[in-house]
């Protein structure tokens, strides 16, 4: 051993090949400050040793997952000069790796992402095993690569390929990385290190020109001027079409690669550093890094819960159709066999067909095979009676959203399943404590609220009733995680968390329409300016105005002081006219099927006529007022949920909003949005609209936080 630290060990073989092994104490390797300092010291030792070549490897199942993102928010709060010092020093280390006086190779297994990918780019050769995933995901955090990724990758695989990698932030499979020249070989895991050392021996024997490889990475890009101009112009258009104005990092990446194309390594790195620092200081980066950290927190809680959980080996869903079929597909495709029970054969057929349709789409996209599809379908057992449920560990009730029907079904199933089987209800609004009254043992009962479409929406709300045991909660959280979902635990109340905060937003929208607002103009502002994937009118059409009408009544009963209403609103107008939204072709908008078989929406003059009859002449509203009147009620209700303990933390609330409702990720969720705006500024804005009713009244705790210049997340 010629060098040893807690994170890196370097040993020299008899053939004078140095083996630099990343092996941090935790479960993964990452480039935190300690590891960067260790790498710097290790490279100094290597340079002065009698090594003839070096292989970079990992003592973990994965190579390096990237920089330590937990350090980012505090680091990015530093002054620009401090941030420049950190990034410049990191690049001194990576340059030192690239400049070693002998050939180098990376032996890559598992993830080599972000800084991990930039480390392998600094070596002369790269060998990956079949488990490898390589990529530069920094744009997903509102950043660009900062350890030389925008400099080395374009010179290695060409500007077009590099920009696709960097601007999408996608992980690359080893075979795809090999095709474009990002790596030099793909081998079986058991042959990885031997193949890497063979490559070094070939370089030492003159069969591979490691110096030419290195020189190419450090030289300007070789692109004719006209071709370069066309290439970067095209890239900007394509990237902006996807990223839009709210996500500046992908466009910044294109500009950096373009600006640095004709520069040396040293000059190009300065361009990268400056752009990185500028992005690191944006609210978008803070929001996206916050989402990443919140996601880790939620998943960490789920992992902890799994230690208390029952082992779910076999599941059941009651109620087939689209929702039941989606739950069955999700469970079976992630390895948990499931019984799908319904009283109606046609509903069972619909559920199985829904699962088959989703699996066929996976096969068509090359993400699955016919054999895997058959295996998943074999894991779904349709049933018209309860007999196959006697051995299941968990039952998810997903029948019609009617408390009497649900109570009857829950009582029936409790008499069939094992005494220790868990029973969960997929309800969006009905009180878990109310439903629990139909059970003899409410301790094994909780809510498990999936979002539609099940296969696309990542969130599951796990709702704890007053009698629900911790083992039940932990087991359902573990099952949701096993299904590939992100579970958040919330306490029981009308609407639980997500729907409770959604309907005040709809109330704000209804208020605007009652005052003469144009629903299409409101949608445009909320989509294009605020950043929602759908505006409120379009969202109501997709959810279904019958569903919205029912849920709104539940919320009004639950919170009459704030959500009760005496006058007819726009949802009532549409519902009473039989306009149910996308499901029957007319809601606020009218719908037809386009050439690709997808629903196409158009403004319907009949909607405007009905709304004018109900509320009078149309009136134009400024974008700021539209945003304020829709968002203030949602924000205050979200804060109330935290204060009442419905949701445990700002992080979990924000993840619920982003994953359950599509809250704009670049804003980070309600609590990140509040901190960015300043709680005092929000309180002042809400007070301006306080005359609109209880939904616009901030809480006393919010006022106190505002007066103390406080925040919901710790200040960096």
UniProtKB/Swiss-Prot annotation:
Coiled-coil features, chain-numbered ranges: none
Residues the entry annotates as binding substrate: 295, 499, 659
Catalytic residues identified in the record: 449 (for 3-hydroxyacyl-coa dehydrogenase activity)
Site feature: Important for catalytic activity: 118, 138
Cysteine-cysteine disulfides: none
GO CC annotation terms, alphabetical: fatty acid beta-oxidation multienzyme complex
Region called Enoyl-CoA hydratase/isomerase, residue ranges: 1-188
EC code(s) of this entry: 4.2.1.17, 5.1.2.3, 5.3.3.8, 1.1.1.35
Annotated pathway: Lipid metabolism; fatty acid beta-oxidation
Annotated NAD(+) binding sites: 323, 342, 399-401, 406, 428, 452
Catalytic activity: a (3S)-3-hydroxyacyl-CoA + NAD(+) = a 3-oxoacyl-CoA + NADH + H(+); a (3S)-3-hydroxyacyl-CoA = a (2E)-enoyl-CoA + H2O; a 4-saturated-(3S)-3-hydroxyacyl-CoA = a (3E)-enoyl-CoA + H2O; (3S)-3-hydroxybutanoyl-CoA = (3R)-3-hydroxybutanoyl-CoA
InterPro entries tied to this protein: 3-OHacyl-CoA_DH_CS, 3-OHacyl-CoA_DH_NAD-bd, 3HC_DH_C, 6-PGluconate_DH-like_C_sf, ClpP/crotonase-like_dom_sf, Enoyl-CoA_hydra/iso, FA_oxidation_alpha_subunit, FadB
One Gene Ontology term from the biological process aspect of the record: fatty acid beta-oxidation
Origin superkingdom: Bacteria
UniProt entry keywords in alphabetical sequence: Fatty acid metabolism, Isomerase, Lipid degradation, Lipid metabolism, Lyase, Multifunctional enzyme, NAD, Oxidoreductase
Pfam families, sorted: 3HCDH (PF00725), 3HCDH_N (PF02737), ECH_1 (PF00378)
GO MF, any single term: enoyl-CoA hydratase activity
Record's function text: Involved in the aerobic and anaerobic degradation of long-chain fatty acids via beta-oxidation cycle. Catalyzes the formation of 3-oxoacyl-CoA from enoyl-CoA via L-3-hydroxyacyl-CoA. It can also use D-3-hydroxyacyl-CoA and cis-3-enoyl-CoA as substrate.
Quaternary organization: Heterotetramer of two alpha chains (FadB) and two beta chains (FadA).
UniProt family annotation: In the N-terminal section; belongs to the enoyl-CoA hydratase/isomerase family.
Protein name: Fatty acid oxidation complex subunit alpha
UniProt source species: Shewanella amazonensis (strain ATCC BAA-1098 / SB2B)
């Amino acid at each position: 051993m010629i060098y040893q630290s807690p994170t890196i060990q370097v040993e020299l073989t008899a053939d004078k090949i140095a083996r630099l092994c990343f092996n941090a104490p935790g479960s993964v390797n990452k480039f935190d400050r300690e590891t960067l300092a260790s790498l710097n010291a290790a490279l100094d030792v290597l340079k002065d040793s009698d090594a003839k070549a070096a292989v970079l490897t990992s003592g973990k199942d994965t190579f390096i997952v990237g920089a330590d993102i937990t350090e980012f928010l505090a680091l990015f709060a530093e002054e620009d000069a401090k941030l420049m010092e950190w990034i410049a020093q990191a690049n001194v280390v990576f340059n030192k790796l690239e400049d070693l006086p002998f050939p180098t190779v990376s032996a890559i297994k598992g993830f080599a992402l972000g800084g991990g990918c930039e480390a392998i780019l600094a070596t002369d050769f790269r060998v990956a095993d079949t488990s490898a995933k390589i990529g530069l995901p920094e744009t997903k955090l509102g950043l660009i690569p900062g350890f030389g990724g925008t400099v080395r990758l374009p010179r290695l695989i060409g500007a077009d390929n590099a920009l696709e990698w960097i601007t999408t932030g996608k992980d690359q499979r080893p075979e795809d990385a090999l095709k474009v020249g990002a790596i030099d070989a793909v081998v079986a895991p058991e042959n990885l290190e031997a193949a890497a050392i063979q490559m070094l021996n070939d370089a030492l024997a003159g069969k591979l020109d490691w110096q030419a490889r290195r020189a190419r990475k450090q030289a300007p890009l070789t692109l004719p001027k006209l071709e370069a101009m066309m290439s970067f112009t095209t890239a900007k258009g394509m990237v902006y079409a996807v990223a839009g104005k709210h996500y500046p990092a992908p466009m910044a990446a294109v500009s950096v690669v373009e600006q640095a194309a004709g520069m040396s390594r040293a000059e190009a790195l300065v361009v990268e550093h400056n752009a990185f620092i500028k992005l690191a200081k944006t609210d978008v980066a803070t929001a996206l890094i916050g989402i990443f950290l919140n996601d880790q927190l939620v998943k960490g809680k789920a992992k902890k819960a799994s230690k208390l959980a029952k082992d779910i080996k076999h599941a059941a869903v009651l109620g087939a159709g689209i929702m039941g079929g989606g739950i069955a597909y999700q469970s079976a495709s992630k390895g948990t066999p499931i019984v799908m029970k319904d009283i109606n054969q046609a509903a069972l057929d619909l559920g199985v067909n829904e699962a088959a349709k989703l699996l066929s789409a996976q096969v068509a996209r090359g993400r699955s095979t016919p054999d895997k599809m058959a295996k998943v379908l074999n894991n779904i057992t349709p049933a018209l009676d309860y007999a196959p449920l006697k051995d299941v560990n968990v039952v998810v009730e997903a029948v019609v959203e009617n408390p009497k029907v649900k109570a009857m079904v829950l009582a029936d199933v409790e008499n069939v399943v094992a005494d220790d089987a868990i029973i969960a209800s997929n309800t969006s609004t009905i009180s878990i404590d109310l439903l629990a009254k139909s059970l003899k043992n409410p301790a094994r009962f909780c809510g498990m609220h999936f979002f539609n479409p099940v296969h696309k929406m990542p969130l599951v709300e796990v709702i704890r009733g007053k009698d629900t045991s911790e083992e039940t909660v932990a087991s359902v959280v573990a099952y949701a995680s096993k299904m590939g979902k992100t579970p958040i635990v919330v306490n029981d109340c009308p609407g639980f968390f997500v729907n409770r905060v959604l309907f005040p937003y709809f109330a704000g929208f209804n208020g605007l329409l009652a005052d003469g607002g144009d629903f299409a103009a409101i949608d445009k502002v909320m989509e294009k300016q605020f950043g929602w994937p759908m505006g409120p009118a379009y969202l109501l059409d997709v959810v279904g105005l019958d569903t919205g009408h029912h849920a709104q009544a539940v919320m009004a009963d639950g919170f009459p002081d704030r959500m009760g209403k005496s006058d007819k609103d726009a949802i009532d107008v549409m519902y009473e006219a039989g306009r149910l939204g996308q499901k029957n072709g007319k809601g606020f908008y009218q719908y037809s099927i386009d050439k690709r078989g997808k629903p196409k929406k158009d403004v319907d003059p009949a909607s405007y006529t009905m709304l004018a009859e109900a509320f009078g002449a149309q009136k134009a509203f400024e974008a700021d007022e539209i945003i304020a009147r829709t968002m203030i009620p949602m924000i205050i209700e979200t804060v109330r949920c935290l204060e009442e303990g419905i949701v445990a933390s700002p992080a979990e609330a924000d993840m619920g909003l982003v994953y359950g409702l599509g809250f704009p990720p670049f804003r980070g969720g309600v609590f990140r949005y509040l901190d960015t705006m300043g709680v005092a500024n929000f309180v002042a804005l809400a007070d301006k609209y306080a005359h609109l009713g209880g939904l616009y009244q901030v809480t006393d705790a919010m006022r106190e936080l505002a007066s103390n210049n406080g925040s919901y997340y710790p200040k960096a």
